[in-house]
């Protein structure tokens, strides 16, 4: 994935994923919602990540916020700023149901966050 990203002309890399939790945490009422992972929150990464979380929360996903890590390959090995969006926890029945009912709205929310970021900058 990183090699493919690095071979293209772009400003940012956005990877869309779905989260999952172990069986002990599936129904705990806490392990649900959207989050965006970045290596750090400088520049476009922090602002756009917050916007994406906020837009997804308007659909009804719990806003788990922006999280940082140095341990994800896709965030470390791309030559442009990178975001990894975890749309929801597919292991949580409520999250999975919300996603299935709002697939198009999820895509629109991510696009709207990008458009809002571009208007501001």
Predicted regions and their residues:
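Catalytic-core regions of hydrolytic enzymes
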Residues: 1-34, 38-47
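Extracytoplasmic/secreted envelope proteins and their assembly/folding machinery
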Residues: 2, 46-53, 107, 111
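Active-site-adjacent mobile loop/cap segments within catalytic or ligand-binding domains
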Residues: 8, 15-18, 22, 65-121
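Short, low-complexity, polar/charged sequence segments that are solvent-exposed and flexible
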Residues: 37-39, 55-58, 102-106
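Active-site-adjacent substrate-binding region
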Residues: 44-67
